[in-house]
Amino acid sequence: MAHRKRQSTASSMLDHRARPGPIPHDQEPESEDTELPLESYVPTGLELGTLRPESPTPEEQECHNHSPDGDSSSDYVNNTSEEEDYDEGLPEEEEGVTYYIRYCPEDDSYLEGMDCNGEEYIAHGAHPVDTDECQEAVEDWTDSVGPHTHSHGAENSQEYPDGHLPIPEDDPTVLEVHDQEEDGHYCSSKESYQDYYPPETNGNTGGASPYRMRRGDGDLEEQEEDIDQIVAEIKMSLSMTSITSASEASPEHMPELDPGDSTEACPPSDTGHGPGRQEARPKSLNLPPEVKHPGDLQRGLKTKTRTPEERPKWPQEQVCNGLEQPRKQQRSDLNGPTDNNNIPETKKVASFPSFVAVPGPCEAEDLIDGIIFAANYLGSTQLLSERNPSKNIRMMQAQEAVSRVKRMQKAAKIKKKANSEGDAQTLTEVDLFISTQRIKVLNADTQETMMDHALRTISYIADIGNIVVLMARRRMPRSASQDCIETTPGAQEGKKQYKMICHVFESEDAQLIAQSIGQAFSVAYQEFLRANGINPEDLSQKEYSDIINTQEMYNDDLIHFSNSENCKELQLEKHKGEILGVVVVESGWGSILPTVILANMMNGGPAARSGKLSIGDQIMSINGTSLVGLPLATCQGIIKGLKNQTQVKLNIVSCPPVTTVLIKRPDLKYQLGFSVQNGIICSLMRGGIAERGGVRVGHRIIEINGQSVVATAHEKIVQALSNSVGEIHMKTMPAAMFRLLTGQETPLYI
């Protein structure tokens, strides 16, 4: 590769600043659709299944190719020729892929749920749609929803292997966008960003990948129906009307799509190359229009930034169609109040994920049009990973990618020196183009596209010193893929290995690059909301956070557990071979100390004979073994192991069998943050006012504001909770204990 002369020191310092610069695309990609099954989720975190990903297809360039083995983690530089497939050994039809990206919101979006008889729990989400007419004019999103409030399986998610490298001594900024995974919680990270994509407003059309996924008209129609229905539900939530009433609403209140809007949303883009790199770039990231070289004027791509009013709107017919089939909710979500025509509309709020503006170094308008950073491309490699790697493992993977690329560079340099006695040039100067639609890597000299990734395919960004690691999902077909390698036959989804492509760059502005990509996700989501007539400020949770911060945690539990009079150490006598004679149940997720509760005692058994224990007591430890945080089955096993002992030492906290809950809700617009089914609390939003008030998953509601609800219908319980303002007093107990005490279950003593 020709070695380009570096700029002067002053120019070089300016050269690394970002500048707006729309990057053209060689051709329009065909849209790709996949079936999107509806799963359920509590809308406290943002998780989106993305559509129509584009395979990162680097164009030809003068560099050394290191083709990876299909089933290994071989290093390679991401430069391929027409004769080589990007992933050696994969058939051409595998180039189409559905990627699933999960947004990990801030701490208030952790979800813990329990399966209540398997009924669906439906919430609202945003879904992508593609149209043949506009090709890539509208990029919206879909949430996968399913029978668990916290489960989001993505068949075709791709993740990467657990590395064993030390965490870097530097304190790198990490921007993380997770895949959808079937795990029990959402990842919380203040450096995570929402993965939503607005319509193509900057003229940046799809990448130039020659590989396309075949799509049937039936799939498109099904997908559009789901998307339209969900977008309609979002709008309904924001207008505070129920699904039933909204389905009967007058059509004139629905947005319409003029034929002109569709044309405006997807202006044809000319094939060409982006502007060349300038010798000096502005110092500020609030950038004026750049001056192009004469040779670049012919290659420039004209873009237009549209106002929210000009962006595509959803057709009236599609919105109405989505409302004609209201879903039967077996669980009632109390993240927002249920519908009540007697309540003023202004008092209701959407149960839709909050919008959190992510600060960054760029102006939103610049990110929509696209900005460019100067960098040196060091190389690429691929890794394998499980579906659900932790944040630490992600960081190790980034370190592993850097190590591999550096080893590869060193080997290439030695080889070049051996072949040609001169000094070898192993760095490639590139322009890193970042927008709300995609990330492109352009050769700085020729402006040829080396890599092109849709923003939604980016799963992880890390800056380590002056190194930037960009991780993107690999292609994966709908059927079983060679990209998915099971370590053992019949391995679970979480144990499968998935491929990921890692690009490594070097730049003085590594931190700015990482921050800008993270900011791009936030701006993309904001644009998506506006394009669908939703004001992001309506989803802001700032006031809600302020209310939460004024409330005490766990009601009076802290005082009760810290009172030494309630903490007792007991010594029980029993005969050898005799069971303790107790039934224990879980205290419920959300309790200050997750342990087991004494739910029943056998008449004449050692526990009952002692007279020292009461139903409702929480057992902290047995014979010095702590039970706090252990699964119920483990605790039961420890108790069963006492059979051959004659003395048992227990540490307990005396508690009444009924838990008192106090929820402070100043206004109906503040969500309660839990869901109920048949009087049982099924899920709970971490950090919400319900958790702070003492609500626990798995508890049955016995009383609300002094009124017994034991024999009350589910709908009336939900209505009572949804319409309650001020202090909401509840009494609850573990559902299993309630069934034992009411004779619905026969106790199995241990």
From Swiss-Prot:
GO molecular function terms attached to this record: amyloid-beta binding; identical protein binding
What residues bear Phosphoserine in this entry? 11, 209
Which residues lie within the region annotated Disordered?
1-94, 143-346
A Pfam family recorded for this sequence = PID
Q: Provide GO CC annotations from the record.
A: presynapse; Schaffer collateral - CA1 synapse
Q: Where is the composition biased (Polar residues)?
A: 70-80, 238-248, 332-344
Biological function: Putative function in synaptic vesicle exocytosis by binding to STXBP1, an essential component of the synaptic vesicle exocytotic machinery. May modulate processing of the amyloid-beta precursor protein (APP) and hence formation of APP-beta.
Assembly and oligomerization: Part of a multimeric complex containing STXBP1 and syntaxin-1. Binds to the cytoplasmic domain of amyloid-beta protein, and to the nuclear factor NF-kappa-B/p65 via its PDZ domain. Interacts with the N-terminal domain of NECAB3.
**Name under which the protein is recorded:** Amyloid-beta A4 precursor protein-binding family A member 2
Name the lineage: Eukaryota, Metazoa, Chordata, Craniata, Vertebrata
Q: What gene name does this entry carry?
A: Apba2
